[in-house]
Structure formats: C-alpha cells, structure tokens
Amino acid sequence: MNIIEGNLHLNGDEKVAIINGRFNHIITDRLVEGAKDAFLRHGGKEENLDLILVPGAFEIPMALEKVLSSGKWDAVCCVGAVIRGSTPHFDYVSAETTKGIANVTLKYGKPVTFGVLTVDSIEQAIERAGSKAGNKGFEAMTSVVELLNLYKNIKA
C-alpha cells in the first residue's frame, strides 16, 4: 500500500493568507502571531504571507470567497474567536462561520484551515491562544503547510 501525505516544509514560494476575524482581538492577535510563526518556521517567506482583517468571525467566509476567487493565494489559514455569552448569538455565529468556511473550501479545492476558536469562556480562549492548550493559530498554519504538500503529492 502506498501512503501519500504532506510534509512540513515549504519551498518558500507558496503564497498564503491569514484571514483574521478581529473581534476579541486580544485573543485573535495571538492566533495570528502563532500562525505567522508556524509559516516562517516551516520555510515560508514573510513577503509571501498576507494578513486580511475582517470585523469578526461571521465575516470570514465572504473574505475567504474573495481571497480564493482572486487566485492570488495558494492557501488560507482562518483564525478568530467566538466566545459564548448569555444569548444564542454564539450558536448562530459559530455555526454559520463553520459552514461558510467549509462550503467555500469545497468550492475552490485549495488548502484552508479552521483556526477559529469556539469556546465557552475567555479562559478557554486564552488557553488556546498560546497558553496551556498551545496556540491554535500555530496548529492551523501547520496544517496549511501539510495540506499544501499533500495536494502537490496527490497531483504528482
């Protein structure tokens, strides 16, 4: 049996975008830093990394649609933070953001990762943005690197 997988090294010519829903920016800024760190550590060049800012997580899917339809980027890492409050707003935003990102990803067939935190408390968000539970932005970008290489290997 042949095993096809992606490695964790970029050639340096890959163009990647980070789309950041900046609401809860104290958290999302840390996710962006983690994503940038992963991109550079795995061989990406800073001039090939773009940060696209949108107001919040709900706006990420439309920005993703615009980014992928432009053909300028090879992959996208989506980050944001939706924190549960006392109203159903959390449920609507997290569900529609997730569905929107998934639908756009399937439409274009390019590597897109979901680094949007959907958490019950600010404490959980802090843990996932570089504290006890690691940095989910770093993890999402590491998955971008792996998927870029996997998709190249599948085409070869």
From Swiss-Prot:
Listed transmembrane segments: none
Report which superkingdom the organism of origin falls in: Bacteria
Q: Does the keyword Metal-binding apply?
A: no
The pathway it acts in is: Cofactor biosynthesis; riboflavin biosynthesis; riboflavin from 2-hydroxy-3-oxobutyl phosphate and 5-amino-6-(D-ribitylamino)uracil: step 1/2
Q: In which residues is (2S)-2-hydroxy-3-oxobutyl phosphate bound? A: S86, T87, R128
Where is the secretion signal located? none
Q: What gene name does this entry carry?
A: ribH
Write down what this protein is called: 6,7-dimethyl-8-ribityllumazine synthase
Role noted for this protein = Catalyzes the formation of 6,7-dimethyl-8-ribityllumazine by condensation of 5-amino-6-(D-ribitylamino)uracil with 3,4-dihydroxy-2-butanone 4-phosphate. This is the penultimate step in the biosynthesis of riboflavin.
Q: Give the enzyme's EC designation.
A: 2.5.1.78
Any idea which residues are catalytic in this one?
H89
Keywords per UniProt: Riboflavin biosynthesis, Transferase
Q: Which reaction does it catalyse?
A: (2S)-2-hydroxy-3-oxobutyl phosphate + 5-amino-6-(D-ribitylamino)uracil = 6,7-dimethyl-8-(1-D-ribityl)lumazine + phosphate + 2 H2O + H(+)
Q: Family membership, please give it.
A: Belongs to the DMRL synthase family.
One GO MF term on file is: 6,7-dimethyl-8-ribityllumazine synthase activity
Binding residues annotated for 5-amino-6-(D-ribitylamino)uracil, in chain numbering: F23, A57, F58, E59, A81, V82, I83, F114
Name the HAMAP family for this protein.
Answer: Lumazine_synth
Q: Does the keyword Membrane apply?
A: no
Q: Name one GO biological process term.
A: riboflavin biosynthetic process
Spell out the CDD domains in the cross-references: Lumazine_synthase-I
Q: Name one GO cellular component term.
A: cytosol
InterPro entries, per the entry: LS, LS/RS, LS/RS_sf
